[in-house]
């Protein structure tokens, strides 16, 4: 908490301490806009750049970011936040010469095809797996056992991704760190995360999320 205060990270007072009954909201789901009611109110008071919230077991991450043009806070889908993290991490690794020649980008079959374009941009093998993050975890294990590919990034549309190979499930804590790092990076360019997302669409093409 002291680190948060020092670094100008604001915690919603009403939701700061553990509350097994979740008395401040109907359903602690970061995919539900109602879960951000208190956070959005605080964000407007302190003029926050981004709003981040995880679910109770911290594997899914919900995101809002300010739109520079309108000043409004815009919500991200799981596809959007996943792609924003991927683009930032992969671009930084490429710039520093840290991308593997046999790198792999793993996604579930119901996730955005924008991932295909990003994988192509960074010369990564795009691998699609069945719905469920456990299948992404299985790919990591397969890579390690068979020395086929190096895992670069994996995500699913339901607000989950994994940066690194320390786990075999989605990890919202590390995703939060990655998005905060990305937010700081883009702020040096006078951009918010929402601005960066629009720039991604303009680069790769606009995508519409939908389930059939």
Where are the regions a protein language model picked out?
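Short, small-residue-biased leader/transition segments that mark boundaries at the very start
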Residues: 1-5
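Structural alpha-beta junctions
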Residues: 6-9, 123-125
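Well-ordered alpha-helical segments embedded in enzymatic catalytic cores
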Residues: 35-39, 85, 135
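Phosphate-binding and adjacent anionic-ligand microenvironments
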Residues: 44, 48-50, 54, 71-74, ...
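Catalytic or ion-translocation cores adjacent to nucleophile or general acid/base/metal-coordination motifs
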Residues: 20, 77-89
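Short Gly/Thr/Asp-enriched flexible loops that form oxyanion-binding sites at enzyme active sites
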Residues: 59-79, 115
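Short low-complexity, flexible loop/linker segments enriched in glycine and/or proline
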Residues: 23-28, 67, 141-145
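N-terminal small/polar loop signature for handling phosphorylated ligands or for N-terminal nucleophile
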Residues: 10-62
């Amino acid at each position: 908490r002291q680190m948060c205060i020092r670094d100008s990270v604001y915690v919603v007072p009403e939701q700061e301490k553990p509350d097994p009954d979740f008395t401040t909201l109907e359903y602690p789901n970061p995919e539900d806009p109602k879960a951000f009611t208190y956070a959005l109110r605080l964000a407007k008071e302190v003029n926050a750049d981004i709003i981040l919230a995880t679910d109770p077991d911290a594997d899914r991450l919900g995101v809002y970011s300010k739109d520079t043009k309108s000043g409004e806070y815009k919500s991200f889908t799981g596809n959007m936040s996943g792609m924003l993290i991927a683009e930032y991490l992969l671009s930084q690794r490429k710039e520093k010469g840290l991308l593997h020649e046999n790198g792999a980008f793993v996604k579930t079959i119901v996730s955005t095809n924008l991932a295909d374009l990003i994988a192509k941009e960074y010369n990564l093998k795009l691998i699609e797996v069945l719905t469920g993050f456990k299948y992404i975890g299985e790919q990591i294990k397969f890579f390690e056992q068979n020395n086929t590919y190096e895992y670069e990034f994996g995500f699913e549309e339901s607000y989950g991704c994994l940066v690194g190979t320390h786990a075999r499930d989605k990890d919202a804590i590390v995703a939060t760190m990655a998005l905060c790092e990305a937010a700081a990076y883009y702020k040096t360019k006078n951009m918010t995360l929402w601005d960066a997302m629009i720039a991604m669409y303009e680069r790769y093409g606009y995508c519409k999320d939908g389930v059939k």
